[in-house]
Amino acid sequence: MKHFGLLTFFLLVGCSLNAVNDKEVENQVIGQEQIEAVSVKPHRTLDEKIGSMLMVGFMGTSAPKHSQICKDIRKYDLAGVILFDMNPVNHKQAKNISGKWQLTKLTRELQACSKDGKLLISVDQEGGKVQRLKSKYGFYGKFPKASDVIQLSDARVQQHYNEMGAELSSVGINYNLAPDVDLAINKKNYVIYKLGRSYGANPKQVVKYASIFMDAMHNNGVLTSLKHFPGHGSSLGDTHKGFVDVTNLWKEVELEPYRLLAQTHNIDTVMVAHVFNKKLDSKYPATLSKKIVNGKLRHEFGFDGVVITDDLQMGAINKKYGLRNTLKLAINAGNDILLFGNQLSVKSMVKTSTLVNNIKNLINSGEVSLNDIEASNKRLDSLKNKL
C-alpha cells in the first residue's frame, strides 16, 4: 500500500501554504479509494468502534484479567496503550516499567486481554533523554540522542538501532513513537534542539538517519511514527506546558522529511503536533485542525495511513479546550488514534469509559460522523496487519 501520493508531493513544493478551503475539505472523500481492502472487524459494536480510536495510558506494572485496563481493552477493543516508566502520582514507584521480566509479563497480559493479540503497545524510545527502557531497570538504556548519532559511522548507527528494535521486540513492545523528524532550525528550541532530538537542520540528513531507524524497527517487527507534523523544530515553546504559536517561525522546509521518506518507505503512522500556525489554520492547532490533518496531510500529501495525535492531555490542548470539544475537533480533523497518556498530571487523568461515552454522545448529536470513525477503524486494521 502506498501511503503518500508522490505526485501531490511534487505539486506541494511549488504551492503556497495557504489554508485549504473549508468547503473543499468537507466535501472531499479523504483517501477512501486508497484505504487497503481491510473491512472493519465483524460484529464490532459502537463502543468497540469508538474504542478502536483510543490509545491510553494506565497505572500498573501488571494487567491481570480483573484489572481496569484489561477490562477496558476487552470491552472497548482499544487501539493500544502507551507505557511509561515514571509514575506521575508517586515518583518513587514505577508506572508501567520496572524491569525486563516484569515488562515482558505485562505486555503478554495486555495482549491476552485483546481480541486479536495485536494490541498496539507503544513507548517513546528515541534515545538520549527520551527512552523509557532505562539501564536502572536492567535495559541497555544508553542509546545516543539524535544529535550524537550523526557523529557515528553508518554501521554503528545501524547497530544501535537494531539493538534498540530487538530490545523493544523482546519485551513485547510493537510500536515505537519515533523517529523524530523535526529539523534543528531553532537553537532556542528546548523540546527538540536543546534535548538533541533532531538529526540536524538538513532534511536529507534527517531522512538518512530516520530511514536507518525505521528499517531497524521494521526488521524487528516494531511499527514507527514520524513526528511531529507539520514541524516542531522551529518552535520556542513547549506544547506540554501550553499554547505554542509558530506562525512567524515555521518554515515550509519542515515538511521535506515527510516528502522524502514517502519516496522510499511505506510509512506506518504520522504523529501530529499541537503547534498553532496561523498560515495553515487561523483558528486551531495542528492536531485539531481539519485543514492541516485532512487538508494538508491527507488531501495534499495523499497520506492514507494512520494519523495519531500527540498526547491530548498536554497543556496546549488541555488548558484551552474542554474534553468534549477536544474529542470532537480531533476526530473531525481526521485523526485515527487519539492519545491520552494519563501521564502529565493526576488532575488530567481520564477514564476510558468517559472518553467512549463522550464520543458516543457526539455521534448521537450528529457532531461526529460514524462513517469517519469506521474509516479510521479500517486504517487501523490495515496497520495491524503489518504485525
Where in the sequence are the language-model features?
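Sec-dependent signal peptide recognition
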Residues: 1-9
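Surface-exposed amphipathic alpha-helices with a cationic face
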Residues: 107-115, 169, 211-218, 262, ...
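Short, well-ordered coil/turn segments that N-cap beta-strands
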Residues: 52, 79, 115-119, 173-174, ...
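C-terminal motif of bacterial Sec signal peptides marking the signal peptidase cleavage site
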Residues: 13-14
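Enzymes and membrane/adaptor proteins characterized by extended Gly/Ser/Thr/Asp/Glu-rich
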Residues: 72, 77-205, 233-246, 273-288, ...
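Phosphate/pyrophosphate-binding betaalpha-module
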Residues: 209-225, 253-267
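Preference for extracellular/luminal or secreted protein segments
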Residues: 17-75, 290, 299-300, 318-387
